[in-house]
C-alpha cells in the first residue's frame, strides 16, 4: 500500500475541514452512461443546439460573474443564459430529455465496446485540461488514466417513457424510492453535493442521485461505470491514496444494494444561487454550504448506477489501449459507489483518499471501503474488497508486535524537547534546561549564616526538613577577632611574663564566648577543604593508577572501559568536543586526600553512624565509608533524579565551577511517582519534574555549601567544569524517611553496591545504644509487663526539656534522660522499632513472606553478635520507645509469647537453607499483600524420633502454624461402637513446605509442581507426621479428627504396596517374624466414615520417605533410580527397611502411566500405585470365609497394649506389617493377599481360582474400606476385607489393576486372592450399583455414610450393626495363620493371571459401578 496521492487541485488555500463537491452549473444534470469524447461530439451534432443550452452548465455567467466568456471560449462552447431554476423549467427540461433516457431495467454488462448515445454529449473536451487525478508514477497510474470502455446504447426503447416519468418525479421531489431511508439529520436547506452519499462498508456498488443537481450519470441495467477497472488492466498492486473525502463519510446514508433515493423529500433542497458574498473568485464553481460548516469546494462528481447485487466478479468489457481519451476525460470512479469526479481547472489537489483492492485492482474511496480516516488505512497490509474476499481472503493488517517497546515522543523530538540519540554528545535534557524550555519553581529554601547551622538548631526545632544553602560570602575562612585593637596593642607592648599574664587575667568579657582552636584553614562551618584543589591534585593524592568509576552522562550508565585517575585527569583537562562523562562516586576517606578533609561540625554532630558505631571497629577501619566523596564533572554533565542511598542526608561544597539542583520534595505522592518512574521503561525519556508538577531549581556557585535532608529527590546539572567535595550521613532526625527510602531501593531493585553499606547494622547499633546509654528502670519494665494497657505518664513530651524545663532527674529515676531527645527523633522511633522487629523475625528463623534465603542470611549477618536473642532485644526496645514517648501503650508484639502465638503471625516448619524456587521468586512481587496477612511463619522443630507423639496442646499452641495431621486411632474391640465411627472429619487446608518464604503457600506436590500441572495430591502431605502418631500411641478425640482423610489415603497406599509387591521370603512363612518384635507394625484402621489411619511409622516394608512432600514417598535418589527406598525421612538408611527384600518389579511399560483404554491390553501388578486422593476414607468391612459364611472368631486385639508397643501376638504380624508398608499409596488391599476394588478368594481344593468375594463397591460407599484380616485357621479360615476409600485418587487410572492370582493346589486353603483396582476408576462412581457378587457364599454389606448417597449394595443377612462390629474385629483381630501370609504371597507371585482374565474383571467392575474412563495427564 503506497502513500496518499492527491489527484485534484483547488484554487485558493485549502479549507481546514473536508471539502464538499462543487455544485452543478446547470439546471439539470445529464443522466446517461459515460462516453468518450468522440461520442459526445458526435451525439452533440445529432441532437442540435437545443440540448446544448442545457449542457452548458459548466460555464454560467448569468447571476454569477465567476465564470467568464474566455473560459467558455477556451472550451469551444457556446455561451448561454442560465435558467431561473424554477420548478416549471426543471419539469420542462426533464420532459424534453425523456426520449434519450435509459430504461430503468438493468441488464448484464455488455461486452460490446460500442459507445452509448449520450444524453448531453460533450461539445469538446480539450486535451489540455489537467487530469482530475494525477498519476503518482508510471508504474502506479491513476484510475483516471486507464483505457475507457464505452457502453452500448440500450436497445429497448419501450421503457423510455417510464424512465422519463420516474426520473422527472424523482427530480421534482414528487416521488421517492420506497427502499431509501431519509437522512433525517439534515437541519438546513443547504446541502453539499455529496450529502446523499454515505459510505457503504460492504463495498457494494451503488448509484446516487444528487437531488436533481450535479453531474450524475445513470447507467443502464447491469452496466458498469465506464471507469470500473478490469482485472486484466495493468493496475499496480499498490494503492494510491490522498486525504479523506470527509464530507462523503459524514452524511451519506448506508444503502444495502438498492438504488438510492434522490427525491428532494428526503434531502433538503439545495439553493442554486448563493448570495454574492459566498461566491469565490477564480476558476471555481459557486459554493454551497454544509449545515454548520464553512464553505467548501470540491469538483463535480459523476456517479454511475451499478447493480452489483447479482454480479460475482468485477470483470468489465475490455478497454482499448488508447491513453489519449483517458487523458482527455481525466475521470475516476469508485468501484463501490461509482462516484465519478470531473476535473476543473484548479491548481490545488482534491481531498479524496483512495484505496486499491489487491485482488481485483479496483479503486475505492476509503469511506466506501469501510475506513473512517487515513489513520485506519495505515494499519492495512493488503486490502481485499467484499467481492474478492471469497477468492483472496480477508483484508490483512500490518502485524503489531506485542513486545513492550520504548515509546518515542516524536512531538517532543519535533519541538526539540527531546534530542535524538545521534544528535548530540550531551544528555537530551541539557538543551531544554539551558534554553529554559523546562519550567521549574523558584526555590524558597533558606540561606543561613554558618554560625546558625548547628545540631542544636535542628534538634530543638522541627528538624532538618528542607535543603539549606550556606552562601560563600557568609562562610569565610577569616578568624573571628575576640579582642579590640587597644588590648592587642597592650599585649604587644608587654615586656615581661608577669605583665602578659596580668593582661590575660583581665581579658575582655566578650572573648570568653569563643573557643580557641587550631587554625587549619577551616571555615565557619568548621569544615576543612584544601584550597586550590584541582582534579590533577586529586589524582595524585588518590593515586594515579587507582581505579575510578566513570559514568557516561548520555546513557546514565557506567563506562565499560577501565578508567584510572591518571586517565580521568587527562580527560578532564582535555578540550574540544568529547563524550560527556562524570565521576560522582569516588570515596576518598581512606586516601591521602581524605586525611586533608574535615566535614562540617553539624554533619559530625548529626551523623548517626559516628554516634553508634563501636569505637573498636572504627579503630581498625571497619565502618561504612561514605563520609568523603570527590565529584568531578565536566560541563553539561547531568545526573537524573535520584535519592541518596539509604535516605541519607548530604553535605555538598562547591570547590570549583557551578552546580544546578532540581529538587522534588519527599511527599508520599512524589515518592510513589518516583518509584513508578524508576520501574518505567520510559525512564530515560520522562522528566520526573513534569510528572510531579513540583520541582524547584537551586543554583550553586563556587564556595557555596548546601545541606540536603533525607529523602529529597534531586537531579544535578553541571553548567561548567566543577569540583565538589561532599558526603552522606544518616541522622536521628529522619528514621522514618531513611527506612522508607531503603524499602524503595529494595522495591526498585537497586543493586546492593549502590545502597548504604551496613544500613541494618547501624539501626541495630542505634537501638543497642539507646538501651545501653539510657536503660529502662526495672520498675517501668515491670509495669509494662504486668499490664498490657500500661502507659507511662508524662506531663509534656521530653523534647520540651531544655532551657528552663531541662530535666535534672538523677540516673535510675523513671524520668531521667541521659541526653536531649528531639521531636523528630521521638517521632521516628516507632518506625525504627518496627523495622528492627522485622529483621529480628527474619534472623530468628521466622518465615517472613517475601524473604529469600540469601536475604535471610544477610539479615542474620547484619545483627550484632553477642547481644542475646534479637527478639528479646527488639521487645525491650519497643518498651523503651513507649517509655520515652510517654502516654502510650507498648506495642502488642512486646508482650511475652505474642510473637509466637499471635494469630497474625503464621508459623511453619523450618526448612534447611537452599536455593529458593524460581517460581517463588517470581511471585514475590505479586504476593506482597499476602505477605502482610501472613506476616511470619515460625518453624516447628520435628525431632527424628517421636516418643510420645504430638500432643494436642502442642498443636494448638501455634494457631497459625501449618496444620499438622493428627491421626485418629480407635481401639475397636468386639461388640463396641464408638462415636468416632460416625464422625465426618473435615479436611483442613495445609501447605507443603518450601525452602523459601517467597510467594504463596504451596499446596502442590513436587511432581505436579515440576510438571506445572494442577495438583490433586493435597491430602497426602500430612501423612508423614500422622504416621508417627499412629505408631506410638492413641491421641485424644479432638486430635483424632484433624486429618482423617489423609489417614485413609495412607491406608489405601499401604494395602496397595502390600498387595502388589508382597514379601518375598521363603515358603516357610517366617519372613516377618523379625519385624514383629519391634512393635512397629500395628493395625490402625479408623472406623470413622471419612477418616482412616494416617501413615504409621518409618519402618514399613515399603520404606516410606515421610520427609518428602505430596505423593513422593521415596527419596529423590531412590525414586529417580527406580529402586526401593530404604531411607527414612531424614535421608538416613533405615535398618528395618534395609533388611526387607526387594520386591518384584514390573515391566518398564507398567511403570509408565497409561490411559484407561490402554489398560485393557496389559496390566502390571507390581507397579507402585500413586496416591492422589483428595478425601480418602478407610472403613473396615466384613470378612468372608471361602465357603461364604462369616467368621466372628477373630481375637480382639488391644491396640495400645499389643500393636503400639510390640506386644502383639504372632497373628498380628502380617496384617499390621502390610498396613505400614506404603503409607499414602492409593490401594485397597491388605496382606496376606492382593486386594483392591475387586476381591476374589480362592476356594480351597480348587486348582483354578474363582471369585469368592464381591467386587468392591464404588467410592460412594465408605463401609467397604476394610483390610484383610488375619486368618484364624491357617487351613480353612481365609477371609477377605474390603478396603475402599470414599473419594479416591484422581490420577490412579495410571496405575495398573491388581487382580487375583492363581494359587497352586498345594496351598488351597491359604490362597486368599484379591485384585486391585486404582481408585481413580472408582472415584467417578456415584450412581447406584449392583449387589456384591460373592461366589459362592454370603457377602458383607456396606455401611453407607450419612453424607454420601446410597451405594445400593446388597446386604445379605448382615445388619449394619453386626457389620460395624465385625468391621472392628477384622481390623484388629489376628490369628497364628497370619504369619504364613508371606509364604502364600511368595507362592502365588509366580502365577500371573492372563490378560483376558484381567480384562474381564475390569469390564465387570466398570459395568457394576458405572465407572467411566479418564484420560491420564501426560
From Swiss-Prot:
Instruction: Copy out the cofactor comment.
Output: Binds 1 Fe(2+) ion per subunit.
What does the entry give for GO biological process? chromatin remodeling; regulation of transcription by RNA polymerase II
Query: Which species?
Result: Aspergillus fumigatus (strain ATCC MYA-4609 / CBS 101355 / FGSC A1100 / Af293) (Neosartorya fumigata)
Q: Which family does it belong to?
A: Belongs to the JHDM1 histone demethylase family.
What protein is this chain from? Answer: JmjC domain-containing histone demethylation protein 1
What is this protein's function per UniProt? Histone demethylase that specifically demethylates 'Lys-36' of histone H3, thereby playing a central role in histone code.
Renumbered residue ranges of the record's region Disordered: 1-86, 102-162, 308-329, 891-964, 1090-1118, 1130-1195, 1250-1394
Compositional bias segments (type: Low complexity): 1341-1352
Recorded catalytic activity of this chain's protein: N(6),N(6)-dimethyl-L-lysyl(36)-[histone H3] + 2 2-oxoglutarate + 2 O2 = L-lysyl(36)-[histone H3] + 2 formaldehyde + 2 succinate + 2 CO2
Amino acid at each position: 500500500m503506497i502513500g496518499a496521492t492527491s489527484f485534484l487541485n483547488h484554487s485558493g488555500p485549502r479549507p481546514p475541514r473536508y471539502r464538499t463537491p462543487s455544485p452543478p452549473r446547470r439546471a439539470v444534470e445529464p443522466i446517461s452512461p459515460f462516453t468518450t469524447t468522440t461520442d459526445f461530439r458526435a451525439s452533440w451534432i445529432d441532437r442540435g443546439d437545443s440540448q446544448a443550452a442545457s449542457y452548458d452548465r459548466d460555464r454560467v455567467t448569468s447571476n454569477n460573474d465567476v465564470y467568464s466568456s474566455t473560459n467558455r471560449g477556451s472550451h469551444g462552447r457556446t455561451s448561454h443564459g442560465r435558467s431561473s431554476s424554477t420548478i416549471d423549467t426543471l419539469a420542462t427540461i426533464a420532459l424534453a430529455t425523456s426520449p434519450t433516457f435509459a430504461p430503468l431495467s438493468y441488464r448484464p454488462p455488455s461486452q460490446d465496446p460500442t459507445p452509448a448515445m449520450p444524453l448531453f454529449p460533450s461539445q469538446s473536451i480539450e486535451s489540455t485540461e489537467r487530469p482530475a487525478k494525477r498519476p503518482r508514477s508510471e508504474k502506479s497510474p491513476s484510475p483516471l488514466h486507464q483505457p475507457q470502455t464505452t457502453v452500448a446504447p440500450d436497445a429497448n426503447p419501450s421503457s423510455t417513457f417510464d424512465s422519463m416519468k420516474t426520473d422527472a418525479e424523482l427530480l421534482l421531489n414528487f416521488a421517492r424510492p420506497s427502499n431509501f431511508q431519509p437522512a433525517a439529520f439534515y437541519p438546513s436547506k443547504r446541502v453539499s453535493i455529496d450529502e446523499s452519499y454515505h459510505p457503504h462498508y460492504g463495498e457494494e456498488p451503488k448509484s446516487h442521485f444528487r437531488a436533481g443537481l450535479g453531474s450524475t450519470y445513470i447507467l443502464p441495467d447491469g452496466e458498469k461505470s465506464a471507469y470500473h477497472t478490469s482485472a486484466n488492466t495493468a493496475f499496480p498492486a499498490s494503492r494510491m491514496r490522498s486525504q479523506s473525502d470527509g464530507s462523503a463519510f459524514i452524511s451519506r446514508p448506508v444503502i444495502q444494494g438498492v438504488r438510492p433515493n434522490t427525491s428532494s423529500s428526503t434531502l433538503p433542497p439545495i439553493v442554486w444561487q448563493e448570495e454574492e458574498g459566498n461566491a469565490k473568485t477564480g476558476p471555481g464553481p459557486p459554493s454551497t454550504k454544509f449545515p454548520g460548516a464553512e464553505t467548501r469546494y470540491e469538483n463535480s462528481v459523476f456517479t454511475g448506477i451499478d447493480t452489483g447485487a447479482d454480479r460475482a466478479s468485477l470483470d468489465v468489457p475490455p478497454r482499448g489501449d488508447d491513453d489519449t481519451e483517458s487523458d482527455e476525460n481525466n475521470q475516476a470512479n469508485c468501484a463501490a459507489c461509482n462516484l465519478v469526479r470531473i476535473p476543473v481547472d484548479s491548481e490545488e489537489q482534491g481531498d479524496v483518499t483512495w484505496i486499491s483492492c489487491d485482488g481485483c485492482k479496483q479503486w475505492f474511496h476509503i469511506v466506501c471501503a469501510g475506513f473512517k480516516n487515513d489513520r485506519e488505512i495505515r494499519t492495512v497490509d493488503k486490502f481485499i474488497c467484499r467481492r474478492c474476499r471469497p477468492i483472496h481472503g480477508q483484508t490483512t493488517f500490518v502485524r503489531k508486535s506485542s513486545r513492550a517497546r520504548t515509546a518515542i515522543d516524536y512531538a517532543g523530538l519535533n519541538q526539540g524537547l527531546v534530542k535524538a540519540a545521534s544528535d548530540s554528545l550531551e544528555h537530551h535534557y541539557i538543551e531544554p534546561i539551558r534554553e529554559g524550555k523546562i519550567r521549574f519553581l523558584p526555590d524558597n529554601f533558606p540561606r543561613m549564616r554558618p554560625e546558625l547551622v548547628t545540631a542544636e538548631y535542628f534538634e530543638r526545632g522541627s528538624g532538618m526538613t528542607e535543603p539549606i544553602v550556606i552562601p560563600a560570602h557568609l562562610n569565610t575562612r577569616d578568624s573571628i577577632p575576640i579582642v579590640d585593637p587597644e588590648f592587642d596593642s597592650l599585649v604587644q607592648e608587654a615586656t615581661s611574663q608577669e605583665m602578659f599574664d596580668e593582661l590575660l587575667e583581665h581579658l575582655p568579657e566578650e572573648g570568653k564566648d569563643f573557643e580557641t582552636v587550631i587554625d587549619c584553614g577551616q571555615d565557619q562551618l568548621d569544615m576543612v577543604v584544601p584550597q586550590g584543589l584541582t582534579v590533577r591534585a586529586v589524582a595524585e593524592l588518590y593515586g594515579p593508577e587507582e581505579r575510578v568509576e566513570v559514568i557516561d552522562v548520555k546513557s546514565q550508565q557506567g563506562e565499560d572501559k577501565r578508567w584510572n585517575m591518571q586517565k580521568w585527569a587527562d580527560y578532564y583537562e582535555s578540550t574540544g568536543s568529547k563524550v560527556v562523562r562524570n565521576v560522582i562516586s569516588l570515596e576518598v576517606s581512606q586516601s591521602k586526600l581524605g586525611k586533608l578533609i574535615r566535614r562540617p561540625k553539624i554533619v559530625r554532630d548529626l551523623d548517626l553512624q559516628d554516634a553508634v558505631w563501636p569505637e573498636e571497629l572504627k579503630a581498625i577501619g571497619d565502618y561504612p565509608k561514605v563520609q568523603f566523596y570527590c565529584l568531578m564533572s565536566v560541563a553539561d554533565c547531568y545526573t537524573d533524579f535520584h535519592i541518596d542511598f539509604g535516605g541519607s542526608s548530604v553535605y555538598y561544597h562547591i570547590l570549583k565551577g557551578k552546580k544546578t539542583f532540581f529538587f522534588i520534595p519527599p511527599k508520599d505522592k512524589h515518592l510513589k511517582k518516583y518509584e513508578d518512574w524508576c520501574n518505567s521503561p520510559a525512564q530515560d525519556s520522562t522528566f520526573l519534574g513534569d510528572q510531579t508538577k513540583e520541582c524547584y531549581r537551586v543554583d550553586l556557585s563556587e564556595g557555596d555549601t548546601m545541606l540536603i535532608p533525607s529523602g529529597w529527590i534531586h537531579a544535578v546539572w553541571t553548567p561548567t567544569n566543577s569540583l565538589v567535595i561532599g558526603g552522606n550521613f544518616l541522622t536521628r532526625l529522619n528514621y522514618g524517611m531513611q527506612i522508607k527510602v531503603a524499602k524503595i531501593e529494595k522495591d526498585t531493585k537497586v543493586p546492593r553496591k549502590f545502597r548504604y553499606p551496613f544500613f541494618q547494622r547501624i539501626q541495630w547499633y542505634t537501638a543497642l545504644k539507646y538501651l545501653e546509654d539510657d536503660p529502662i528502670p526495672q520498675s517501668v519494665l515491670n509495669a509494662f509487663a504486668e499490664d498490657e494497657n500500661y502507659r507511662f505518664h508524662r506531663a509534656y513530651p521530653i523534647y520540651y526539656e531544655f532551657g528552663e524545663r531541662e530535666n535534672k532527674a538523677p540516673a535510675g529515676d523513671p524520668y531521667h534522660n541521659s541526653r536531649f531527645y528531639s521531636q523528630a527523633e521521638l517521632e521516628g522511633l516507632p518506625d525504627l522499632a518496627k523495622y528492627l522487629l522485622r529483621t529480628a523475625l527474619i534472623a530468628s528463623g521466622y518465615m517472613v513472606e517475601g524473604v529469600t534465603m540469601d536475604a535471610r542470611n544477610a539479615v542474620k549477618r547484619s545483627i550484632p553478635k553477642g547481644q542475646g536473642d534479637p527478639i528479646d532485644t527488639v521487645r525491650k526496645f519497643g518498651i523503651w520507645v513507649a517509655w520515652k514517648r510517654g502516654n502510650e501503650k507498648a506495642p502488642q508484639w512486646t508482650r511475652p509469647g505474642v510473637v509466637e502465638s499471635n494469630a497474625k503471625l503464621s508459623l511453619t516448619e523450618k526448612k534447611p537453607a537452599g536455593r529458593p524456587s524460581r517460581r517463588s521468586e517470581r511471585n514475590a512481587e505479586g504476593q506482597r499483600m499476602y505477605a502482610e496477612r501472613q506476616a511470619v511463619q515460625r518453624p516447628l522443630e520435628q525431632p527424628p524420633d517421636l516418643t510420645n507423639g504430638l500432643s494436642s496442646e502442642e498443636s494448638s499452641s501455634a494457631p497459625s502454624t501449618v496444620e499438622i495431621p493428627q491421626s485418629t486411632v480407635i481401639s475397636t474391640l468386639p461388640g463396641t461402637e464408638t462415636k468416632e465411627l460416625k464422625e465426618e472429619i473435615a479436611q483442613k487446608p495445609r501447605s507443603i513446605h518450601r525452602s523459601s518464604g517467597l510467594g504463596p503457600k504451596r499446596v502442590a506436590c513436587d511432581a505436579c509442581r515440576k510438571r506445572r500441572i494442577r495438583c490433586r495430591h493435597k491430602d497426602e502431605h500430612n501423612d508423614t507426621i500422622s504416621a508417627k502418631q499412629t505408631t506410638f500411641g492413641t491421641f485424644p478425640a479432638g486430635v483424632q479428627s484433624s486429618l482423617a482423610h489423609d489417614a485413609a489415603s495412607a491406608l489405601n497406599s499401604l494395602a496397595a504396596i502390600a498387595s502388589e509387591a508382597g514379601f518375598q521370603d521363603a515358603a516357610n512363612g517366617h519372613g516377618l517374624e523379625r519385624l514383629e518384635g519391634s512393635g512397629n507394625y500395628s493395625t490402625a484402621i479408623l472406623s470413622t466414615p471419612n477418616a482412616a489411619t494416617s501413615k504409621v511409622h518409618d519402618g514399613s516394608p515399603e520404606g516410606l520417605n515421610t520427609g518428602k512432600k505430596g505423593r513422593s514417598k521415596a527419596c529423590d535418589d531412590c525414586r529417580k533410580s527406580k529402586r526401593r527406598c530404604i531411607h527414612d525421612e531424614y535421608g538416613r538408611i533405615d535398618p528395618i527397611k534395609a533388611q526387607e527384600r526387594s520386591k518384584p518389579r514390573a515391566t518398564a511399560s507398567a511403570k509408565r502411566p497409561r490411559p484407561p483404554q490402554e489398560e485393557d491390553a496389559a496390566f502390571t501388578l507390581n507397579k507402585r500405585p500413586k496416591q492422589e486422593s483428595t478425601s480418602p476414607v478407610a472403613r473396615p468391612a466384613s470378612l468372608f470365609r471361602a465357603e461364604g459364611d462369616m467368621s466372628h472368631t477373630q481375637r480382639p486385639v488391644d491396640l495400645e497394649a499389643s500393636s503400639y508397643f510390640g506386644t502383639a501376638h504372632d497373628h498380628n504380624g502380617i496384617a499390621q506389617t502390610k498396613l505400614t508398608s506404603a503409607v499414602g499409596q492409593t490401594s485397597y488391599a491388605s496382606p496376606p493377599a492382593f486386594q483392591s476394588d475387586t476381591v476374589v478368594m480362592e476356594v480351597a481344593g480348587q486348582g483354578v481360582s474363582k471369585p469368592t468375594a464381591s467386587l468392591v463397591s464404588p467410592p460412594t460407599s465408605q463401609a467397604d474400606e476394610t483390610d484383610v484380616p488375619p486368618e484364624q485357621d491357617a487351613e480353612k479360615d481365609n477371609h477377605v476385607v474390603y478396603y475402599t476409600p470414599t473419594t479416591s485418587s484422581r490420577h490412579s487410572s495410571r496405575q495398573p489393576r491388581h487382580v487375583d492370582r492363581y494359587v497352586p493346589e498345594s496351598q488351597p486353603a491359604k490362597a486368599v486372592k484379591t485384585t486391585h483396582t486404582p481408585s481413580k476408576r472408582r472415584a467417578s462412581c456415584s450412581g447406584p450399583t449392583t449387589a456384591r457378587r460373592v461366589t459362592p457364599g454370603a457377602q458383607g454389606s456396606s455401611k453407607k455414610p450419612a453424607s454420601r448417597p446410597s451405594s445400593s449394595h446388597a446386604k445379605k443377612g448382615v445388619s449394619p450393626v453386626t457389620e460395624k462390629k465385625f468391621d472392628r474385629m477384622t481390623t484388629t483381630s489376628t490369628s497364628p495363620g497370619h504369619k504364613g501370609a508371606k509364604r502364600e504371597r511368595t507362592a502365588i507371585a509366580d502365577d500371573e493371571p492372563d490378560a483376558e482374565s484381567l480384562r474381564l474383571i475390569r469390564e465387570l467392575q466398570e459395568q457394576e459401578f458405572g465407572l467411566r474412563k479418564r484420560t491420564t495427564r501426560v
